[in-house]
Amino acid sequence: MRKFIPVFLLSVFVLGACSSWNKTATGTAAGAGAGAALGAVIGGLIGHDGKSAAIGAAIGTAVGGGAGALIGRKMDKKAEELAALNAKVETVTDANGLEAIKVTFDNGILFATNKATLSAQSQKELKEFAAKMADMPDTDVTVYGHTDNTGSAEVNEKLSTQRANAVAGYLQSCGIASSRIKAEGKSYTMPVADNATKEGRAQNRRVEVYVSANEKMIQAAENGTLK
């Protein structure tokens, strides 16, 4: 039986072997949080240095606890399915205070050093991810590319953007609509570990894929029709 580890991030870190997914918040609590802060950016991606970026689009209206619970259960179920990937899957909180999913891919698996061309293995992993997302068209997918702090900010900004775009483009080719996908390079501005060590730099070289409820899913949850 998998144990849930509290986190406040929304990513999946691909390791050498299949990893478990980690639950961070229940749908009820997340929905209640959104209701308490109208349209506030509550959730996000929080780096080692404390910087953060919101995940998903804030809809500007309160989301009730009941709707949050429905979305939470749907995200839990999908996270369990995604756990079959060669990845670590976590549930986190998005910009509306709702449960979302984070998938983080190690750049060492996705790309060759200083390259932005997807490897055959990474294409296989991303194709499997896209296939498992086919039954959730009412979600948004956000892709962030990250690097360590080796090299100039300009070089790392370009590389992280190219890698994020490569992942987003491949997911589109696998059937995820371009209207659902956002890609952005973060360079080394949001580390999750200490760049002073080799191990820390390895953790910081990653691509994160975030899955969050879009307005259509939220509306269905509010109406009680979300399945």
Residue ranges, per PLM feature:
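Stable alpha-helical elements in mature extracytoplasmic
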Residues: 37-38, 74, 78, 122-125, ...
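C-terminal motif of bacterial Sec signal peptides marking the signal peptidase cleavage site
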Residues: 14-17
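Envelope-exposed proteins and targeting segments
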Residues: 97-101, 105-107, 114, 137-139, ...
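Amphipathic, membrane-active segments
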Residues: 74-102, 222
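Sec-dependent signal peptide recognition
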Residues: 2-10, 38
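Periplasmic peptidoglycan-binding/anchoring modules of Gram-negative envelope and division proteins
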Residues: 110-144, 172, 209, 216-227
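Periplasmic OmpA-like peptidoglycan-binding domain that tethers envelope proteins to the cell wall
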Residues: 146-220
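Short, low-complexity, glycine-enriched hydrophobic/amphipathic alpha-helices that associate
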Residues: 19-81
